[in-house]
UniProtKB/Swiss-Prot annotation:
Superkingdom field: Bacteria
Keyword Cytoplasm attached: no
Swiss-Prot/TrEMBL keywords: Endonuclease, Exonuclease, Hydrolase, Metal-binding, Nuclease, tRNA processing, Zinc
Similarity section: Belongs to the RNase Z family. RNase BN subfamily.
Residue numbers binding Zn(2+) 2: 68-69, 212, 270
Xref: Pfam families: Lactamase_B_2
Source taxonomy: Bacteria, Pseudomonadati, Pseudomonadota, Gammaproteobacteria, Enterobacterales
Protein's recorded name: Ribonuclease BN
Main enzyme class: hydrolase
Residue positions of the active site: 68
Entry GO MF terms: 3'-tRNA processing endoribonuclease activity; exonuclease activity; zinc ion binding
Quaternary structure and partners: Homodimer.
Length: 306
């Protein structure tokens, strides 16, 4: 899994930071799969500075309906049609997302020439398919807001082909079924259990991408044990009370969550426009006082989950 940050500012853009949006490239072995998390104003323009194209998106997840996470969506959807893209697209987000998209398209006389599905989510499982389990967690914000936990399925262990051949199983298409741990029947009537020929499985990676939130119990549940946590860090620690009153988190509150949840890496993002580069580095230092393995997200930063 690989993250590309298209926008890392909160509320309004700055000269160096666009509105919130993140590409998740799943790098599937058999086909391309690309997801987008939030779509603030200017997101489609940010795409132009990356190797990616909106027409290749399969899914878009919206955390909440505040404009800095959403107002780039209608334009991106329309441009996708104008550029002749036909790949189906599914949108996920809180109640009201369907009305927002349909109203924006209707009032502007716009449409999509590709299949567009809009699914309004609630707390709990969003889907479990094609190697990934996505769960939505309710957060603490003035409007309905979710974070998304993306858990990669465990990868099957290596198939012991040499032992299969030694046991009289001929190489060929059956090996693909056995690799998946399935049972197959041979021409001589023997039934072979693939799971007996597999080495230890490799645990899948887990990614927690938060929407806007003040500290809350659900945040801990969502982040627990994640390999990577992407979390807003809107204000510095001295302004924690102000941040919380508006449904946001401070630098050290975010770091404390990462520490308590036992995450591998914290990527801090969604910085107030009041902070220049020096101010953001100051917040990074505050985070690292509590959770040393913290990274500061910047527009177009790429992070690959090893």
């Amino acid at each position: 899994m690989e993250l590309t940050f298209l926008g890392t500012s909160a509320g309004v853009p700055t000269r160096t930071r666009n509105m919130t949006s993140i590409i998740l490239n799943l790098q599937q072995p058999t086909r391309a799969e690309m997801w987008l998390f939030d779509c603030g104003e200017g997101t489609q323009h940010q795409f132009l500075h990356t190797p990616y194209h909106p027409g290749k998106l399969n899914k878009i997840f919206i955390t909440h309906l505040h404009g800095d996470h959403l107002f780039g969506l209608p334009g991106l959807l329309c441009s996708r049609s104008m550029q002749g893209n036909s790949l189906p697209l599914t949108l996920y987000g809180p109640k009201g997302l369907k009305e927002f998209v349909e109203t924006a398209l209707r009032l502007s006389g716009s449409w999509t020439d590709y299949p567009l599905t809009i699914i309004e989510v609630g707390p709990g499982l969003v889907f479990d398919e094609e190697g990934y389990r996505v769960t939505a967690y309710p957060l603490s914000h003035p409007v309905e807001c979710y974070g998304y936990r993306i858990a990669q399925h465990d990868k099957p262990g290596t198939l012991d082909a040499a032992q299969l051949i030694a046991d009289g199983v001929p190489p060929g298409p059956l090996f693909h079924q056995l690799k998946r741990g399935q049972r197959v029947e041979l021409a001589d009537g023997r039934v072979i259990d693939g799971s007996r020929y597999l080495g230890p499985s490799t645990p899948g990676k887990t990614l927690a991408i938060f929407g806007d939130t003040a500290p809350c119990p659900q945040a801990l549940e969502m982040a627990r044990g994640a390999d990577v946590m992407v979390h807003e860090t809107t204000l510095e620690q001295a302004m924690a009370e102000k941040a919380n009153s508006r449904g946001h988190s401070s630098s050290q509150q975010t770091a404390a969550l990462a520490k308590e949840a036992g995450v591998g890496t914290l990527i801090a993002t969604h910085f107030s426009s009041r902070y220049d580069a020096e101010g953001c580095l100051r917040m990074l230092a505050e985070c690292r006082e509590i959770f040393p393995n913290t990274l500061l997200a910047e527009d177009f930063m790429v992070y690959k989950m090893a």
